[in-house]
Amino acid sequence: MLRHALLSLSLTLPLVFAACDGADRLAAPPVTAERFGVPNALVPSGGSIQAAIDAAAPGAVILISPGTYHEALTVAKAGIKLVGRGDVTIENPGDAEDGISVSDAGDGFALVNVTVRGFEENGVLLTGVDGFLLANVRAIDNGEYGLFPVFSSNGVIERCRASGHSDTGIYVGQSHHVIIFGSVAFGNVNGIELENSSDVQAVGNETFDNVAGILVVLLPGLDIKTSANILVAGNRVHDNNHPNFAAPGEIESFVPSGSGILVVGTDRTTVSQNVVTGNAFTGIAVGSTLLLGALAGLPPEAFADIEPNPDGARITRNVATGNGAASPIPFLPGVDLLWDGSGTGNCWERNRFGSSYPAPLPACVNAS
């Protein structure tokens, strides 16, 4: 049931965002506990959420009373829904790597109105989960990743916040049919990252004070070798000039600070109706994964298992102004709109911008 509801939501949301002015124009109602009906269990303040999960039947709705819970949670049952009532925080009890870990047995998982804070690696990790909902979740200072669905599908990340992560605040990796909307990411290396994924949308979000606001990327060495059909629309992407604090040697440590929206190696990516301002390197860039590899000092053969060039990118109807004040890359200028010349079928149309490289950029045929 939840899977079908999420599929319906992900298909209809693009119609909701006709104005595409950002998160404040979202028409979808916020998620509340009432959406899930009568709860099957109530965790009292000071109780154990994990004990409630262990005792629950598949499909159970678990309501969590206000309070701070020092425990790490594991979910391996289908349809579990954890719903916070009031101010609910899950904090690291010691040296736990993951705050909430959901396995591939946890299809239909939902997490609503909860803060996850201070875990060593990941705030919320979903691995192989089909049909998930993360709504009004706040991920704060969780090592590398805040919200981290991987090998997952048919998911919605709605009105979440993520800050203080040395890789990515809100990440979708090697997944398909996922939408991120109405969310805020700040103070991370990457605010939002869509990596080696297809049929994914990032719509109506705000990213600021990250190294890069939104990164859409195809990387080598992963199980999924392609990334296509990505929509980045109606987002506010501004002032992403944070110094890069990723672990030295990690590929994220070579993401250039001052980046608004980066499209790196993916195919058929549409970037439309975003407002992108105040990013010191570039507002919206389209380039090859080989460029990121060059910054990392990797040889071209390191990318032999992927086709690293972006094809079919459409950059339309964006406002990209006040970017490019100071490029950190000697061989590329700081501009509002940037293309490294790689790939085929990439085009730009009806954008409002002050500078581009090259100039002019290729125009779209049948622009929308």
Q: Which residues make up each language-model segment?
A:
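Acidic Gly/Asp/Thr-rich repetitive segments characteristic of extracellular carbohydrate-active
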Residues: F36-H70
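Right-handed parallel beta-helix
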Residues: R85-V88, D107-G118, D130-E144, S153-T168, ...
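Acidic, glycine- and Ser/Thr-rich low-complexity intrinsically disordered tracts
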Residues: L63, L292-S368
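Right-handed parallel beta-helix/beta-spiral solenoid domain characteristic of secreted/periplasmic
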Residues: P44-G47, V61-P66, G79-E121, L125
